[in-house]
């Protein structure tokens, strides 16, 4: 029933969007380096009128206009994005299909390349904040980005980062207890102490630089570090996606979040494994990262992306 309701809601959003006849843009893309304890790059996708060309970044291929001017007109809403972690390490380039689609739909997307760190729950939210500040201060974007309309998306560990940036508190004692009881959830529990040493670790306090986000989209989110009390401040519209054949247990992650949030989120499931939210792979990437690029029999990753990228664009437009 919930899936039916979501489908109808998204269909209505699509009709409303069509009636509004939003302007058609092409995708611009650029990078900047942000200074931090470990400097990091930020990928920015944005609306432009310049022609797109084929671009290769390592094993990733996409169409965009590199370093083109931002389209003129009204200010554009901003969408922050946090990629996954773990092995293999994540990158926003693995989500270029989605990020560039949002740029063509009239959003400015800010996506840091999170460097490796021993404190990802602390460092990645800070990197998101620094990336946003740097883009809003950049003369190319300062009068084109709307600082009053900011949303955020995250995939896998990036889903946890998204929740923290929105004001959620992590609870390592809760995470440790979950992993003690659910050792089979290896994607959620790798490296997590289950010997009782985390039992008295207090929940984190609210992230000092929590942003006034208007809406969130979570793709296969890492939800095990959160419990109901730590999510109590997140009373905002949210869309949560899960993969039907994921090895990240939904009852401890995506579904657990949906039950614990103060406002019931919209939920959607797609066929495939955890990495189905990564773009369809080039032959080079498939050879380098077969786990990321392999899908269960019958999974049509390209068709799934075509569906959810428009659903996400419609959801963000309705809430930003």
Q: What role is predicted for each listed range?
A:
Residues 234, 240-242:
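Short beta-strand/loop motif that positions the catalytic acidic residue
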Residues 236, 247-260:
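Short alpha-helix in the alpha/beta-hydrolase fold that links the catalytic acid
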Residues 261-292:
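Catalytic histidine neighborhood in serine/cysteine hydrolases
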Residues 21-79:
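Domain-level recognition of soluble alpha/beta enzyme cores
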Residues 283-320:
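Catalytic active-site module of serine/aspartate enzymes centered on a nucleophile-bearing elbow/loop
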Residues 224-225, 244-249, 275:
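Acidic catalytic loop of the alpha/beta-hydrolase fold
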Residues 118-151, 160-164, 173-189, 193, ...:
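Alpha/beta-hydrolase active-site loop
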Residues 52, 63-120, 246-250:
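Short substrate-entry loop that stabilizes the transition state in hydrolases
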């Amino acid at each position: 029933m919930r899936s039916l309701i979501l489908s109808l809601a998204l269909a209505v959003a699509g009709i409303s969007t069509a009636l509004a006849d939003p302007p058609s843009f092409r995708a611009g893309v650029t990078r900047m380096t942000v200074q931090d304890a470990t400097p990091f790059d930020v990928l920015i996708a944005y609306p432009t009128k310049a022609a797109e060309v084929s671009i290769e970044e390592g094993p990733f291929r996409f169409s965009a206009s590199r370093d083109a001017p931002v389209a003129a007109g009204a200010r554009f809403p901003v969408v922050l994005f946090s990629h996954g972690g773990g092995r293999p390490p994540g990158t926003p380039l693995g989500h270029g299909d989605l990020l560039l689609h949002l740029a063509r739909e009239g959003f400015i997307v800010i996506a840091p390349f999170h460097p490796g760190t021993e404190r990802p729950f602390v460092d990645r939210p800070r990197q998101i904040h620094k990336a946003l500040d740097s883009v809003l201060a950049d003369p190319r974007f300062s009068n084109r980005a709307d600082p009053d309309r900011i949303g955020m998306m995250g995939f896998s560990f990036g889903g946890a980062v998204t929740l923290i940036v929105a004001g959620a508190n992590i609870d390592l004692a809760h995470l440790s207890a979950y992993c003690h009881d659910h050792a089979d959830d290896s994607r959620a529990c790798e490296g997590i102490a289950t010997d009782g040493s985390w039992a008295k670790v207090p929940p984190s306090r609210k992230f000092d630089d929590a942003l006034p986000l208007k809406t969130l989209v979570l793709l296969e989110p890492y939800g095990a570090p959160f419990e109901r009390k730590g999510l109590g401040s997140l009373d905002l519209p949210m869309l949560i996606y899960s993969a039907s054949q994921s090895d990240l247990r939904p009852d401890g992650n995506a579904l657990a979040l949906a039950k614990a949030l103060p406002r019931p989120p919209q939920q959607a499931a797609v066929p495939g494994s955890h990495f189905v939210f990564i773009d369809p792979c080039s032959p080079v990437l498939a050879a380098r990262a077969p786990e990321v690029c392999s899908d269960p029999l019958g999974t049509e990753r390209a068709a799934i992306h075509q569906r959810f990228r428009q659903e996400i664009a419609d959801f963000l437009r309705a809430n930003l």
